[in-house]
């Protein structure tokens, strides 16, 4: 029985902790296990108590108990975790490896060691990273594809995976795990003799190795393909596939037909990011008047909006996407949804939102729609840089009526720390406030750490494919406002990164 197994695993963890504690207390009644939040630099001076606590972590009995805890936690988490989240974490696990290698190659551990336990803001951290790149010492922050915002998102994935600490929003510090790959060299030494970083070390830092997809972001001054550009087509994806095309035009090239078909069906699979049919709770669809029109912008084959069309027959849903996608959309669904298409309750229109302003459309019932009731952008903005996203949003804003709503469906990534700016409970929280998913007083990270790491992995994947990223709620609010939209509501299920953000014209 599953509950019996879960309780057995829970008990095993407790017993193993007891075994570890006995070893520590046999040496000293007050001796504690090393904290993950406190770095342990091998080249530094330590108190006798710190040295003993660290050495006991390798004691045979302690190590065996620790291994049982890791095994039980892994078994427990895979048993209760939603299979989709587990798959995403494992399929994209290489992204975490790339980010660890980036952290090592960019000398972030050494920079943060000298910054101390208070940590360093990403603005200052990026400046020091660039100063340690021989060909980039005169480059200004933001002169290449790696910006402070990108750096913050990379390090937030690592903090969410417990490889760093985010002590305040966008301020990061080392922890016990990151300190393990410290070379022991000073930043000044690395500036003068970068080729000797691994000399006279235990080889741990050197073993981390090198990767290209994320490292290309830090190659400002080294790689002319990515220098001085923030265009989507300058993403590492373009280097990997040796193409100047953006991802979606590349997907439509002859020879990529199977990839294009797979992508369309894969977007239907992205329903798994949210609670089942959460799109129906993400907006007050029933409050819209009879005949209201929902435009699903860049909606692919309509994998999410078709749920709305089926549940709310008083609405008319129009999915807009590029011609190759739209032409295959209806046939992709088979006979099940034929009544929706035959009645005109759901239809498709070929449109590239970059090529022209949004123009009126004529429905099957003869009505001309000059502006819809709702524009929906689901998993769209995370595909584009902020500049390109602003172009999309500005065009929709120009087509909107005062009563038009914008609904954005995307992952909204909390910080890996508590945000004191949102801790004031004397006033109603802003819709853009960063939530804390952890219970009060819990040692869990506010974003639930490994329980939500899948979203932070996707964040870095978007960076590598599109020079884009997932956003915090504050970043989303600022982006929408810059294009003439004000956030009025954010809906998400407890502990889930997925959110539907509603905005109105301003």
Which sequence ranges carry the predicted segments?
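Alpha-helical subdomain
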Residues: 1-152, 166-168, 287-506
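A short secondary-structure junction signal
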Residues: 122-123, 184-185, 222-223, 275-279
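Short, contiguous, pocket-lining structural segments
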Residues: 255, 259, 267-271, 296-300, ...
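Conserved alpha-helix/loop element of class I SAM-dependent methyltransferases that forms part
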Residues: 269-293, 307
């Amino acid at each position: 029985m599953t509950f019996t197994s879960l309780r057995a695993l829970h008990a095993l963890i407790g017993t193993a902790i007891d075994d570890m504690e006995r070893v520590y207390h046999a040496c000293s009644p007050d001796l504690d296990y090393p904290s993950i939040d406190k770095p342990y630099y091998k080249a530094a001076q330590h108190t006798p108590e710190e040295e003993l606590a660290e050495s006991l972590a390798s004691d045979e009995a302690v190590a065996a108990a620790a291994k049982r805890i890791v095994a039980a936690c892994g078994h427990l988490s895979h048993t209760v975790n939603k299979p989709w989240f587990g798959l995403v974490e494992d399929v994209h696990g290489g992204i975490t490896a790339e980010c660890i290698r980036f952290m090592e190659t960019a000398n972030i551990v050494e920079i943060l060691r000298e910054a101390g336990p208070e940590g360093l803001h990403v603005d200052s951290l990026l400046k020091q990273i660039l100063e340690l790149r021989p060909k980039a010492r005169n480059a200004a922050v933001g002169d290449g594809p790696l910006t402070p915002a990108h750096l913050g998102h990379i390090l937030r994935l690592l903090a969410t995976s417990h490889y760093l600490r985010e002590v305040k929003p966008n301020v990061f510090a080392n922890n016990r795990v990151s300190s393990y790959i410290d070379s022991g060299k000073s930043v000044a030494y690395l500036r003068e003799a970068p080729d000797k970083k691994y000399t006279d070390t235990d080889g741990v830092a050197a073993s981390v190795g090198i990767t290209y997809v994320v490292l290309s972001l830090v190659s400002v001054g080294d790689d002319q393909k990515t220098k001085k550009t923030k265009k989507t087509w300058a993403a590492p994806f373009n280097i990997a596939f040796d193409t100047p095309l953006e991802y979606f035009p590349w997907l439509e090239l002859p020879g990529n037909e199977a990839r294009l078909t797979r992508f369309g069906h894969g977007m239907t699979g992205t329903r798994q990011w949210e609670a089942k049919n959460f799109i129906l709770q993400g907006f007050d669809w029933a409050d819209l008047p009879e005949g209201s029109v929902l435009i699903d912008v860049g909606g692919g084959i309509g994998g999410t909006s078709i749920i709305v069309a089926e549940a709310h027959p008083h609405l008319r849903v129009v999915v807009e996407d590029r011609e190759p996608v739209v032409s295959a959309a209806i046939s992709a669904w088979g006979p099940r949804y034929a009544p929706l298409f035959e009645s005109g309750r759901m239809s498709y229109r070929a449109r590239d939102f970059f090529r022209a302003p949004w123009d009126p459309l004529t429905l099957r019932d003869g009505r001309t729609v000059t502006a819809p009731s709702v524009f929906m952008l689901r998993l769209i903005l995370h595909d584009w840089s902020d500049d390109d996203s602003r172009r999309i949003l500005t065009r929709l804003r120009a087509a909107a009526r005062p009563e038009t709503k914008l609904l954005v469906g995307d992952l909204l990534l909390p910080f890996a720390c508590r945000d004191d700016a949102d801790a004031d409970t004397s006033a109603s929280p802003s819709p853009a406030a960063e939530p804390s998913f952890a219970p009060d007083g819990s040692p869990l990270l506010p974003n639930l750490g490994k329980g939500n790491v899948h979203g932070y992995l996707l964040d870095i994947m978007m960076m590598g494919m599109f020079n884009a990223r997932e956003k915090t709620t504050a970043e989303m609010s600022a982006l929408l406002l810059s294009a003439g939209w004000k956030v009025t509501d954010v809906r998400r299920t407890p502990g889930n990164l997925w959110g539907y953000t509603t905005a109105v014209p301003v």
